Amino acid sequence: MSKEPIIKLDNIDVTFHQKKREINAVKDVTIHINQGDIYGIVGYSGAGKSTLVRVINLLQEPSAGKITIDNQVIYDNKVTLTSTQLREQRREIGMIFQHFNLMSQLTAEQNVAFALKHSGLSKEAKAAKVAKLLELVGLSDRAQNYPSQLSGGQKQRVAIARALANDPKILISDESTSALDPKTTKQILALLQDLNKKLGLTIVLITHEMQIVKDIANRVAVMQNGKLIEEGSVLDIFSHPRESLTQDFIKIATGIDEAMLKIEQQEVVKNLPVGSKLVQLKYAGHSTDEPLLNQIYKEFEVTANILYGNIEILDGIPVGEMVVILSGDEEKLRQACQAITDSQVQLTLLKEGGKA
């Protein structure tokens, strides 16, 4: 994957003026997105994430900052392109939304063809391109269907085909799966991931769900109240989240919070005996946790009772999380915990035996 940024947003501010007050929707945000990235921007409603991505193609003009797209500066405290140049630049960037915005009176192929209206292609070339795009998104057999005859997932596939009609280098997905059921969401995310690989497409995902980022992104930014509060590779953010909001997003995405509620109700945890510790283990890159637990038993005679375990594959790397009860002699238990930490596994003490 190329390390050359295709999108550079530097010190972006967006301020709205409403009556006698100012709303600072985006505050001094800098984000660089590399060619070929699937880059997630996560935040709750009102975080400023949708406003931020709309500055990428100047659908929203910032109040200050610099925007560079594919090595071309398009904004430097003012728009640097003519209206014609800006139209050409916007052809390089496709967008899909939560609402599909299809024209109900047009068939699937006609909706896609509409995006080629000013392409200069012949009628035959347009038809061939539309057919290719519908095949790309898995809808060749639905070309003659109207939107009312399509499911939500199929409508979004038409919207994706339309967004790709002018061969953009960048695709912005603004909450594009929010209106879809979980199964269809996974299918659309798999399609986006496939397009990223086949076309070398750079994808910017706007979402309030860390689960979506976890499934397909390689980098993520977290926004809160217009500010960028955390940014990095998905692996780093999931392994070592710094900010409390990021930690909350990750707990929801991994299901650990729900698991902990059940674990805390177990009798063995409520009445944890002296000589036992309830610990949470997190690791990245280890193919399995079993050798480590076997090792501490062999070396320190410390047993491990696994109460919860989960492994995710993030950007091709396994990331694991476990909740276990470690039991043994006090000194051996201390040594075992140190050995676990020394093996690059993050250990968090949740409860100590004999204590409330």
Curated annotation (Swiss-Prot):
Keywords: Amino-acid transport, ATP-binding, Cell membrane, Membrane, Nucleotide-binding, Translocase, Transport. Its EC number is 7.4.2.11. It catalyses: L-methionine(out) + ATP + H2O = L-methionine(in) + ADP + phosphate + H(+); D-methionine(out) + ATP + H2O = D-methionine(in) + ADP + phosphate + H(+). It is a peripheral membrane protein. It is found in: Cell membrane. Its main location: membrane. It is an enzyme of class 7 (translocase). GO terms for cellular component: plasma membrane. One of its GO terms (molecular function) is ATP binding. Residues 7-250 form the ABC transporter domain. ATP binds at G43, Y44, S45, G46, A47, G48, K49, S50. Belongs to the ABC transporter superfamily. Methionine importer (TC 3.A.1.24) family. Part of the ABC transporter complex MetNIQ involved in methionine import. Responsible for energy coupling to the transport system. The complex is composed of two ATP-binding proteins (MetN), two transmembrane proteins (MetI) and a solute-binding protein (MetQ). This is Methionine import ATP-binding protein MetN. The lineage of its organism: Bacteria, Bacillati, Bacillota, Bacilli, Lactobacillales.
